[in-house]
């Protein structure tokens, strides 16, 4: 949880409902404690909380002496507790802080819903403001429709809560929302409180500690859990809100295929410094994501099939449904013959083995179960031969795996994903490896599938048992489920009334399959000749003479296939599909169809669209369901180590047809969207627009937002790993050492190789395990392609050769994959399938060098042409906020990032390249964190041109997207912030004097910061002694090691996350403010105070930076930091350093107050100030206990009881500070 969800500048918020929720949850926790730990221990906890509350209140009122006295008394009492008392006390305070955090998130959602005026960051408010300021509505519509924001979820180790606890927290938030209802009866309210009591008790009785380090697969499952838990519901709500605001202010609805928001992931793809992320893991995670996507879509399709029961449809949908039926007949007849022939052959063999006469059986076997002259089907012949043959034939007619449509059922537990993700060593196409843990191909979701034929009424479905379903499914009989049962309850010959008389359904089906007769007609389903379809389909009789219809069938057909168009192609690419035509504004098309419908007589309409007794949408969606089930089964095969069945690709999605035979799996979102779009426009054509704009539209929006993999996976690796791989190649080929070449030599050789067409790496080249892993990663990337993967990010980019090296390794891998596949699928280097390569600039020196690196890249002939041909003249660059801050301090890093963005914008514009900046921000201010709208709107002008990528890390993912209502607000805030930064970019520094002052501030702050952090010989020892940095390794909060490959114990090799995390624990939070006070004081000494105050008021970049520092300073507590030093630091010189740091903190606070003009910290934001003061009485006791536990643990490092107590205290402080790393 984080404070950044609260708007800076908010004057006042009524916190009474929040305080009521906190009291309710606190009282429930108290009731639980009385039962769990006893009245005596509970009273001791109450006493300690009361002491902490009094000390905090006195401190707020300015009575420092009395507050210090109470704090000292509190510390003495806490440090004398034994562990049997300290652990429940720490747990109680930690749970209270977590519960209050849940209440705060819920209060934010409640506040937005209750206000009469729209949230100033809402779509409605921002659109209205832009129109008022003179923005043309058409320009606004285009900007929103073409906007592309992507949030990339990462698994950086800052989420201390187990996923089990996160789920319970989400459940409590949902119950609080229900508790707010004013229409609850007294009994219902009591029941609601009882539900809350049960959840709180379950929290207390659940172990809050991870007992083993999470794997990358565990982290990936956590990311997928967020999608299922909240984003799946939040995205369509957000799209509806966005479309409604657009319609209100521009007169246009949001295009159906627009994707203003997408999600990416690093979970399972970020291998920078994490040896646990391998090529196998990456392949496994992508299969897991596609399994989850297919499963979620299956649930929606099941519900849609129940809802879309109407029998009116457009010509396009009717054509699609007929093709599905026809191919289902062919498939089913083949199954009948095969089963009957096998059974008859077995009967004849058995009879012969017993010496009996088998002439009739042999004859029947020779006939192969074909239809006989008197109309008896193969099933009838089988019955004459024996019961086994009859049963085999009957199975083929009665089997239907689609089942009865039914309303939405509760979501399956996300643990089903966990079952599928275990193990190592499974087969992957092309010889890659996934895992070996066996998994049934029939998951729990599939076991519950009902069984009714898609063309029948819900009430009259055909039922069968699950074993029969399994037998037919194992036989690959997917096509048999696509059509209604034509033969009634019997599989033999039967006559059914149709629109044109009677037909023997079994006979007609078998004859049609043989090609000897026209294919059968669906009972009671009129059709008409379609000159554009194959002869076999055109033979279907029609109920009336074909002729012109009052509807534009050609236009509707175009609408039904619009999903396959637009930028992005097969994988949905990154671009939106809202450019023009039917893929753009749907408003005109809807109005036109409604006008045509109202202008057509009911008789004409019925003749053209009604199909009595037939359910075309269920037929089409049934086929969609089969393909989704096949997709899910294929992923199960990959995840469990089985070789996937080699089904041919094609069907409805391929070519816009309506059949599909074996119902292959889905590869791209456009394939899945095509039949859904056809159904959508068919409903509008038939007067059912209000139906189309319900669940079906929500599903279409989800398809284009989540695709077939939910979140595309980025790959990330350090630049030196690529250089080492190429060094192994050049050394083996006798070309010298790549690592020893100059930058010019590297660029020259890389360009020459990329311009050529020959393979570079010999197949039999010996290599180390590290080099093999790098090459295997590129091979997996070549297999997975852009349908599954997003960008390839190069961390620690130093030169243009780092980017060119990745391009060469990508091309080499695709050539190898193409050769292994025998040339199938276009695996060559010219197929445009390479991932976009994204350099990441992190340190202060790298940020300064970014301009030269990108200039050299964009002026390289090969790279420039590659960028144009493959990536549409678009370049993405990532900026690192974490390492730059650790390297130079927050203020110097912020200014370097700002200038870097300005230069990158100028370079790309000069080269006619569209730039997307990818911001690698963390949760805390020390790592670039802060409120979303402030962060985006303080970027340099021109750096946000409708595209924006950003990471959300660790605890921030749950805080911003874990609850559906909060996620909805976040999505809207991202959208409007990017829109404002695009259409009303923030102003640059208005005077050159401001730049000069910023340069001075940056220089002084960097020098002050580095003199302490990097140049003081005492600092590293003080850091290790005064914080729990060393002990953080025992907290299993991430799969990645805390340090990079270099083993030396220095600040430079320490990851930015534990660096921030450790300082947050002792409440000094040094990385976020160190150096800033010295810089501001130096500027004010030179007479720049008025300039600083003007910069704060008028320059968004500087103002937001100062506001964030002020918020961090309000969270610091030098008294707590002094306690850590007093108890844990023994060296007098280190203690002097600690005293100097606290003195610098005080000076920084004074300097910030002078610049802002505030009387006290956060006096301009009383809401946030109040929230921080509400937490202090619970955080302070945990800090004091942590100090004592650290002291004891360092004397007895193997004491597991002390370790547990320390980890519980770390969790509790993280909950109270609302951010960790």
UniProtKB/Swiss-Prot annotation:
Biased composition (Gly residues): 565-575, 648-661
Pfam families cross-referenced by the UniProt entry: PEPcase
GO cellular component: cytoplasm
InterPro entries recorded: PEP_COase, PEP_COase_bac/pln-type, PEP_COase_Lys_AS, PEPCASE_His_AS, Pyrv/PenolPyrv_kinase-like_dom
Ranges that cross the membrane: none
Annotated Low complexity bias: 503-513, 550-564
Keyword Magnesium among record annotations: yes
GO terms of molecular function: phosphoenolpyruvate carboxylase activity
EC number(s) on file: 4.1.1.31
Active site: 156, 886
UniProtKB keywords: Allosteric enzyme, Carbon dioxide fixation, Cytoplasm, Lyase, Magnesium, Pyruvate
Superkingdom classification of source: Eukaryota
Region (Disordered): 443-588, 642-661
Functional summary from the UniProt entry: Through the carboxylation of phosphoenolpyruvate (PEP) it forms oxaloacetate, a four-carbon dicarboxylic acid source for the tricarboxylic acid cycle.
Family to which the UniProt record says this protein belongs: Belongs to the PEPCase type 1 family.
HAMAP family named in the record: PEPcase_type1 (MF_00595)
Protein name per UniProt: Phosphoenolpyruvate carboxylase 2
Lineage: Eukaryota, Viridiplantae, Chlorophyta, core chlorophytes, Chlorophyceae
């Amino acid at each position: 949880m984080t404070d950044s969800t609260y708007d800076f500048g908010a004057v006042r918020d009524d916190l009474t409902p929040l305080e009521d929720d906190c009291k309710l949850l606190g009282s429930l926790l108290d009731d639980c404690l009385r039962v769990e730990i006893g009245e005596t221990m509970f009273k001791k906890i109450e006493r300690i909380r009361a002491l902490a509350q009094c000390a905090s209140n006195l401190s707020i009122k300015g009575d420092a002496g009395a507050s210090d006295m109470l704090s000292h008394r509190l510390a003495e009492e806490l440090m004398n507790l034994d562990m049997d008392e300290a652990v429940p006390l720490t747990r109680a305070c930690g749970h209270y802080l977590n519960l209050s955090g849940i209440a705060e998130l819920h209060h934010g959602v409640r506040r937005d819903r209750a206000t009469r005026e729209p949230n100033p960051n809402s779509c409605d408010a921002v659109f209205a403001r832009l129109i008022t300021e003179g923005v043309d509505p058409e320009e606004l519509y285009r900007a929103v429709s073409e906007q592309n924001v992507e949030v990339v979820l990462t698994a950086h180790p800052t989420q201390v809560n187990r996923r089990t606890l996160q789920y319970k927290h989400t459940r409590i938030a949902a119950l609080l929302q229900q508790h707010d209802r004013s229409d609850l009866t007294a009994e219902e309210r009591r029941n609601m409180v009882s539900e809350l009591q049960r959840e709180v008790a379950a929290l207390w009785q659940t172990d809050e500690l991870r007992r083993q380090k999470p794997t990358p697969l565990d982290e990936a499952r956590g990311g997928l859990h967020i999608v299922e838990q909240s984003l799946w519901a939040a995205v369509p709500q957000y799209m509806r809100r966005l479309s409604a605001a657009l319609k209100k202010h521009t007169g246009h609805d949001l295009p159906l295929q627009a994707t203003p928001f997408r999600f990416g992931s690093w979970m399972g793809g970020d291998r920078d410094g994490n040896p646990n992320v391998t090529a196998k893991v990456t392949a496994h995670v992508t299969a897991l994501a596609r399994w989850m996507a297919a499963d979620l879509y299956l649930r929606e399709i099941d519900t849609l099939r129940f809802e879309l029961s109407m029998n009116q449809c457009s010509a396009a949908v009717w054509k699609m449904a007929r093709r599905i039926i026809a191919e289902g007949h062919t498939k089913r007849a083949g199954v009948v013959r095969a089963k009957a022939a096998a059974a008859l052959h077995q009967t004849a063999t058995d009879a012969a083995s017993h010496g009996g006469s088998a002439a009739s059986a042999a004859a029947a076997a020779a006939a192969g179960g074909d239809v006989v002259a008197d109309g008896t089907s193969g099933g009838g012949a089988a019955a004459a031969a024996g019961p086994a043959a009859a049963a085999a034939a009957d199975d083929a007619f009665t089997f239907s795996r689609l089942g009865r449509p039914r309303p939405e059922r509760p979501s399956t537990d996300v643990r089903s994903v966990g079952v599928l993700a275990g193990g190592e060593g499974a087969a992957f196409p092309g010889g890659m490896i996934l895992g070996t843990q066996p998994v049934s191909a029939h998951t729990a979701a599939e076991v519950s599938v009902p069984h009714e034929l898609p063309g029948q009424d819900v009430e009259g479905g055909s039922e069968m048992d699950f074993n029969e379903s399994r037998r037919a499914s194992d036989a690959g009989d997917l096509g048999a489920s696509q059509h209604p049962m034509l033969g009634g309850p019997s599989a033999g010959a039967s006559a059914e009334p149709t629109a044109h008389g009677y037909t023997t359904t079994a006979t007609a089906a078998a004859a049609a399959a043989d090609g000897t007769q026209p294919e059968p007609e669906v009972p009671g389903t009129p059709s008409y000749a379609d000159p554009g379809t194959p002869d076999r389909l055109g033979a279907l009789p029609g109920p009336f003479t074909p002729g012109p219809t009052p509807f534009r069938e050609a236009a509707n057909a175009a609408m039904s296939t619009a999903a396959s168009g637009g930028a992005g192609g097969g994988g949905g690419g990154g671009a939106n599909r809202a450019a023009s035509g039917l893929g753009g504004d749907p408003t005109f098309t809807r109005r036109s169809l409604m006008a045509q419908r109202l202008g057509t007589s009911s008789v004409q309409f019925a003749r053209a669209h009604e199909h009595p007794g037939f359910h075309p949408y269920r037929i089409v969606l049934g086929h969609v369901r089969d393909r989704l089930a096949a997709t899910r089964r294929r992923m199960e095969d990959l995840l469990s180590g089985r070789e996937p069945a080699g089904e041919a690709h094609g069907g409805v999605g391929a070519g816009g047809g309506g059949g599909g035979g074996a119902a292959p799996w889905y590869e791209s979102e456009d394939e899945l969207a095509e039949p859904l779009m056809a159904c959508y426009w068919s409903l509008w054509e038939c007067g059912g627009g209000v139906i189309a704009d319900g669940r079906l539209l929500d599903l279409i929006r989800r398809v284009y937002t989540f695709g077939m993999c939910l979140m595309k996976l980025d790959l990330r690796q350090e630049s030196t790993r690529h250089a080492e791989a190429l060094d192994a190649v050049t050394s083996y080929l006798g070309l010298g050492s790549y690592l020893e070449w100059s930058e010019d030599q590297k660029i020259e050789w890389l360009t020459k190789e990329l311009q050529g067409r020959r393979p570079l790496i010999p197949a039999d080249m010996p290599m180390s395990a590290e080099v093999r892993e790098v090459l295997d990663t590129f091979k997996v990337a070549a297999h997975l392609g852009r349908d599954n993967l997003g960008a390839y990010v190069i961390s620690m980019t130093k030169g243009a050769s780092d980017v060119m090296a990745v391009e060469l390794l990508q091309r080499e891998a695709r050539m190898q994959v193409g050769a292994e596949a025998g040339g199938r699928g276009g695996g060559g280097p010219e197929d445009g399938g390479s991932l976009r390569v994204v350099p990441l600039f992190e340190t202060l020196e790298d940020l300064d060098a970014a301009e030269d690196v990108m200039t050299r890249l964009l002026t390289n002939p090969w790279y420039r042409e590659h960028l144009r041909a493959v990536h549409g003249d678009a370049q993405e660059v990532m900026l690192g906020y974490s390492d730059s801050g650790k390297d130079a301090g927050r203020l110097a890093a912020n200014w370097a990032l700002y200038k870097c963005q300005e230069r990158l914008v100028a370079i790309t514009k000069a080269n006619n390249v569209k730039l997307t900046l990818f911001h690698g921000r963390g949760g805390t201010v020390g790592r670039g964190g802060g409120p979303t709208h402030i962060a985006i709107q303080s970027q340099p002008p021109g750096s946000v041109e409708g595209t924006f990528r950003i990471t959300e890390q660790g605890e921030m993912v749950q805080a911003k997207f874990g609850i559906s209502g909060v996620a909805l607000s976040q999505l809207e805030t991202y959208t409007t912030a990017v829109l404002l930064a695009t259409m009303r970019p923030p102003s640059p520094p208005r005077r050159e004097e401001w730049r000069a002052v910023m340069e001075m501030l940056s220089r002084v702050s960097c020098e002050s910061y580095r003199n302490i952090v990097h140049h003081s010989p005492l600092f590293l020892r003080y850091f290790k002694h005064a914080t729990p940095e060393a002990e953080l390794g025992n907290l299993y909060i991430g799969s990645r090691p805390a340090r990079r490959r270099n083993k030396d114990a220095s600040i430079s090799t320490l990851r930015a996350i534990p660096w921030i995390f450790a300082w947050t624990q002792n409440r000094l939070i040094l990385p976020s403010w160190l150096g800033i006070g010295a810089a501001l004081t130096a500027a004010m000494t030179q007479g720049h105070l008025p300039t600083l105050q003007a910069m704060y008021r008028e320059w968004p970049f500087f103002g937001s930076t100062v506001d964030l520092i002020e918020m961090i300073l309000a969270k610091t507590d030098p008294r707590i930091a002094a306690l850590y030093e007093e108890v844990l630091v023994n060296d007098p010189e280190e203690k002097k350093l600690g005293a100097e740091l606290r003195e610098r903190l005080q000076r920084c606070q004074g300097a910030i107050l002078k610049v802002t003009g505030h009387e006290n910290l956060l006096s301009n934001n009383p809401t946030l100030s109040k929230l921080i003061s509400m937490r202090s009485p619970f955080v302070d006791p945990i800090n004091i206990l942590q100090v004592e536990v650290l002291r004891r643990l360092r004397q007895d490092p193997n004491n597991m009881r002390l370790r547990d107590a320390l980890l519980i205290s770390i969790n509790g402080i993280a909950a109270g500070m609302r951010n960790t790393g």
